[in-house]
Swiss-Prot record:
The gene is nep1. This is Ribosomal RNA small subunit methyltransferase Nep1. The keyword S-adenosyl-L-methionine applies. HAMAP family: NEP1 (MF_00554). The record marks R65, R106, R109, R113 as: Interaction with substrate rRNA. Belongs to the class IV-like SAM-binding methyltransferase superfamily. RNA methyltransferase NEP1 family. The keyword rRNA processing applies. GO terms for biological process: rRNA base methylation. Keywords: Methyltransferase, Ribosome biogenesis, RNA-binding, rRNA processing, rRNA-binding, S-adenosyl-L-methionine, Transferase.
Amino acid sequence: MNMKEPISIILLESALELVPKELWKHPAVVKNARRRGKKPGETLLDVSLHYHAMKKLKDKEKRGRPDIVHISLLNALESPLNKEGYLRIYIHTYPGHIIFVKPETRIPRNYNRFVGLMEQLLIHGKVPPDSDDPLLYVKTMTISDLLEKINKNGIILLREHGEKEKPENIVKYAVENNYAIGIGGFPHGDYSQEIISISKAEFSIYNKPLTTWITISRVIVGAEHLYNII
Protein backbone atom coordinates (compact mmCIF):
# COMPACT_ATOMS: atom_id res chain seq x y z
CA MET A 1 0.00 0.00 0.00
CA ASN A 2 1.35 3.41 -0.92
CA MET A 3 1.11 5.68 2.07
CA LYS A 4 0.94 9.34 1.13
CA GLU A 5 0.53 10.69 4.64
CA PRO A 6 2.11 9.69 7.97
CA ILE A 7 -0.20 8.02 10.47
CA SER A 8 -1.20 10.16 13.43
CA ILE A 9 -1.27 8.67 16.93
CA ILE A 10 -2.64 10.65 19.86
CA LEU A 11 -1.98 9.56 23.45
CA LEU A 12 -5.23 10.56 25.11
CA GLU A 13 -5.78 11.96 28.63
CA SER A 14 -2.17 11.18 29.40
CA ALA A 15 -1.12 11.07 33.05
CA LEU A 16 1.38 13.90 32.56
CA GLU A 17 0.84 17.20 34.37
CA LEU A 18 2.36 19.62 36.84
CA VAL A 19 1.22 19.21 40.46
CA PRO A 20 -2.24 20.86 40.65
CA LYS A 21 -2.66 23.87 42.91
CA GLU A 22 -4.84 22.07 45.48
CA LEU A 23 -1.87 19.81 46.36
CA TRP A 24 0.89 22.42 46.60
CA LYS A 25 0.84 22.55 50.42
CA HIS A 26 0.73 18.80 51.03
CA PRO A 27 3.84 17.61 52.93
CA ALA A 28 4.72 14.97 50.31
CA VAL A 29 4.62 17.57 47.54
CA VAL A 30 6.54 20.18 49.54
CA LYS A 31 9.21 17.64 50.52
CA ASN A 32 9.87 16.51 46.95
CA ALA A 33 9.89 20.07 45.59
CA ARG A 34 12.27 21.27 48.29
CA ARG A 35 14.62 18.36 47.66
CA ARG A 36 14.79 19.34 44.00
CA GLY A 37 15.06 23.07 44.65
CA LYS A 38 11.78 23.83 42.88
CA LYS A 39 8.38 25.28 43.68
CA PRO A 40 5.63 22.63 44.14
CA GLY A 41 3.79 23.86 41.05
CA GLU A 42 6.92 23.43 38.93
CA THR A 43 7.18 19.67 39.52
CA LEU A 44 5.43 16.80 37.77
CA LEU A 45 2.64 14.95 39.53
CA ASP A 46 3.96 11.45 40.22
CA VAL A 47 2.02 8.86 42.19
CA SER A 48 5.23 7.17 43.33
CA LEU A 49 6.16 10.42 45.12
CA HIS A 50 2.74 11.93 45.81
CA TYR A 51 0.60 8.88 46.62
CA HIS A 52 -0.74 10.23 49.92
CA ALA A 53 -1.28 13.70 48.47
CA MET A 54 -3.36 12.25 45.63
CA LYS A 55 -5.80 10.24 47.77
CA LYS A 56 -8.64 12.77 47.39
CA LEU A 57 -7.69 14.00 43.93
CA LYS A 58 -10.35 13.68 41.22
CA ASP A 59 -9.69 10.75 38.85
CA LYS A 60 -6.62 9.85 40.90
CA GLU A 61 -6.41 6.40 39.30
CA LYS A 62 -5.76 8.02 35.90
CA ARG A 63 -3.17 10.59 36.98
CA GLY A 64 0.44 10.93 38.09
CA ARG A 65 2.18 8.47 35.75
CA PRO A 66 4.65 10.44 33.58
CA ASP A 67 6.56 7.20 32.93
CA ILE A 68 3.77 6.04 30.60
CA VAL A 69 4.43 8.93 28.22
CA HIS A 70 8.19 8.46 28.61
CA ILE A 71 8.23 4.79 27.62
CA SER A 72 5.66 5.32 24.86
CA LEU A 73 7.63 8.16 23.28
CA LEU A 74 10.86 6.18 23.40
CA ASN A 75 9.12 3.30 21.60
CA ALA A 76 7.45 5.51 19.02
CA LEU A 77 10.27 7.89 18.13
CA GLU A 78 12.87 5.11 17.83
CA SER A 79 10.64 3.01 15.57
CA PRO A 80 11.43 2.34 11.89
CA LEU A 81 8.04 3.91 11.08
CA ASN A 82 9.19 7.21 12.55
CA LYS A 83 12.70 6.93 11.11
CA GLU A 84 11.12 6.61 7.65
CA GLY A 85 9.05 9.73 8.26
CA TYR A 86 5.64 8.07 8.51
CA LEU A 87 4.63 8.80 12.10
CA ARG A 88 3.23 11.85 13.85
CA ILE A 89 2.61 11.58 17.57
CA TYR A 90 0.74 13.99 19.83
CA ILE A 91 0.29 13.93 23.60
CA HIS A 92 -3.09 15.00 24.96
CA THR A 93 -2.78 15.48 28.73
CA TYR A 94 -5.37 15.01 31.46
CA PRO A 95 -5.67 18.80 32.11
CA GLY A 96 -6.38 19.42 28.42
CA HIS A 97 -3.08 20.41 26.84
CA ILE A 98 -1.70 19.11 23.54
CA ILE A 99 2.03 18.47 23.26
CA PHE A 100 3.32 18.61 19.69
CA VAL A 101 6.37 16.41 19.11
CA LYS A 102 8.69 16.83 16.15
CA PRO A 103 9.62 13.43 14.63
CA GLU A 104 13.35 14.15 15.01
CA THR A 105 13.03 14.76 18.77
CA ARG A 106 15.38 12.64 20.88
CA ILE A 107 13.69 11.88 24.19
CA PRO A 108 16.11 11.32 27.11
CA ARG A 109 16.37 7.65 28.01
CA ASN A 110 17.00 8.56 31.63
CA TYR A 111 13.67 9.05 33.43
CA ASN A 112 14.87 11.87 35.69
CA ARG A 113 16.11 13.83 32.68
CA PHE A 114 12.76 13.23 30.99
CA VAL A 115 10.95 14.61 34.04
CA GLY A 116 13.09 17.75 33.94
CA LEU A 117 12.38 18.15 30.22
CA MET A 118 8.62 17.84 30.69
CA GLU A 119 8.63 20.29 33.59
CA GLN A 120 10.50 22.79 31.43
CA LEU A 121 8.03 22.23 28.59
CA LEU A 122 4.89 22.66 30.71
CA ILE A 123 6.28 25.76 32.44
CA HIS A 124 7.72 27.55 29.41
CA GLY A 125 5.43 26.15 26.71
CA LYS A 126 8.23 24.92 24.46
CA VAL A 127 11.61 23.17 24.40
CA PRO A 128 14.13 24.66 23.91
CA PRO A 129 12.48 27.65 25.67
CA ASP A 130 14.20 30.29 23.52
CA SER A 131 13.76 28.52 20.17
CA ASP A 132 11.68 29.83 17.27
CA ASP A 133 11.46 26.26 15.97
CA PRO A 134 11.08 24.09 19.11
CA LEU A 135 11.26 20.30 19.13
CA LEU A 136 8.36 20.19 21.58
CA TYR A 137 5.66 22.74 22.25
CA VAL A 138 2.38 22.73 24.14
CA LYS A 139 -0.98 24.34 23.43
CA THR A 140 -4.29 24.37 25.27
CA MET A 141 -6.87 22.94 22.87
CA THR A 142 -9.51 20.25 22.56
CA ILE A 143 -9.09 17.01 20.64
CA SER A 144 -11.58 18.32 18.08
CA ASP A 145 -9.41 21.42 17.62
CA LEU A 146 -6.34 19.23 17.18
CA LEU A 147 -8.03 17.01 14.60
CA GLU A 148 -8.98 20.11 12.63
CA LYS A 149 -5.44 21.50 12.88
CA ILE A 150 -3.86 18.30 11.57
CA ASN A 151 -6.56 17.84 8.91
CA LYS A 152 -8.05 14.59 10.17
CA ASN A 153 -11.66 13.53 9.61
CA GLY A 154 -11.97 12.10 13.11
CA ILE A 155 -10.41 9.73 15.61
CA ILE A 156 -10.71 6.01 16.36
CA LEU A 157 -9.98 4.59 19.80
CA LEU A 158 -8.03 1.61 21.02
CA ARG A 159 -10.20 0.41 23.88
CA GLU A 160 -10.39 -2.79 25.91
CA HIS A 161 -14.00 -3.51 24.92
CA GLY A 162 -13.67 -2.41 21.30
CA GLU A 163 -14.08 -4.63 18.24
CA LYS A 164 -11.25 -7.18 18.10
CA GLU A 165 -9.01 -6.54 15.12
CA LYS A 166 -5.41 -6.96 14.00
CA PRO A 167 -3.23 -3.85 14.37
CA GLU A 168 -2.47 -3.86 10.65
CA ASN A 169 -6.17 -3.70 9.80
CA ILE A 170 -6.79 -0.94 12.34
CA VAL A 171 -4.07 1.18 10.75
CA LYS A 172 -5.47 0.47 7.28
CA TYR A 173 -8.95 1.56 8.39
CA ALA A 174 -7.57 4.74 9.94
CA VAL A 175 -5.56 5.67 6.85
CA GLU A 176 -8.37 4.92 4.39
CA ASN A 177 -10.73 7.19 6.35
CA ASN A 178 -8.12 9.82 7.28
CA TYR A 179 -8.60 9.19 11.00
CA ALA A 180 -6.13 9.65 13.84
CA ILE A 181 -5.57 6.70 16.18
CA GLY A 182 -6.23 7.37 19.87
CA ILE A 183 -4.55 5.36 22.63
CA GLY A 184 -5.11 5.96 26.34
CA GLY A 185 -2.11 7.50 28.09
CA PHE A 186 -3.33 6.63 31.59
CA PRO A 187 -2.80 3.55 33.82
CA HIS A 188 -6.35 2.68 34.95
CA GLY A 189 -9.94 3.58 34.19
CA ASP A 190 -11.51 4.57 30.89
CA TYR A 191 -11.69 7.50 28.54
CA SER A 192 -13.86 10.42 29.58
CA GLN A 193 -17.29 10.67 27.99
CA GLU A 194 -16.03 13.69 26.06
CA ILE A 195 -13.47 11.51 24.28
CA ILE A 196 -15.80 8.55 23.75
CA SER A 197 -18.47 10.80 22.24
CA ILE A 198 -16.23 11.98 19.38
CA SER A 199 -14.76 8.60 18.39
CA LYS A 200 -15.66 7.17 14.99
CA ALA A 201 -14.96 3.55 15.98
CA GLU A 202 -13.43 1.51 18.79
CA PHE A 203 -11.01 -1.38 18.37
CA SER A 204 -9.15 -3.82 20.59
CA ILE A 205 -6.02 -5.80 19.75
CA TYR A 206 -6.15 -8.23 22.68
CA ASN A 207 -8.76 -9.69 25.02
CA LYS A 208 -7.01 -8.43 28.17
CA PRO A 209 -5.82 -4.96 29.21
CA LEU A 210 -2.49 -3.85 27.73
CA THR A 211 -0.14 -1.09 28.78
CA THR A 212 -0.02 2.04 26.67
CA TRP A 213 3.50 1.34 25.44
CA ILE A 214 2.69 -2.20 24.35
CA THR A 215 -0.40 -0.98 22.51
CA ILE A 216 1.43 1.80 20.71
CA SER A 217 4.27 -0.54 19.76
CA ARG A 218 1.84 -3.08 18.28
CA VAL A 219 0.03 -0.39 16.28
CA ILE A 220 3.34 0.92 14.96
CA VAL A 221 4.52 -2.57 13.98
CA GLY A 222 1.17 -3.08 12.22
CA ALA A 223 1.80 0.09 10.22
CA GLU A 224 5.35 -1.00 9.41
CA HIS A 225 4.06 -4.30 8.03
CA LEU A 226 1.26 -2.60 6.11
CA TYR A 227 3.69 -0.28 4.36
CA ASN A 228 6.46 -2.83 3.90
CA ILE A 229 8.92 -0.88 6.03
CA ILE A 230 10.02 -4.07 7.80
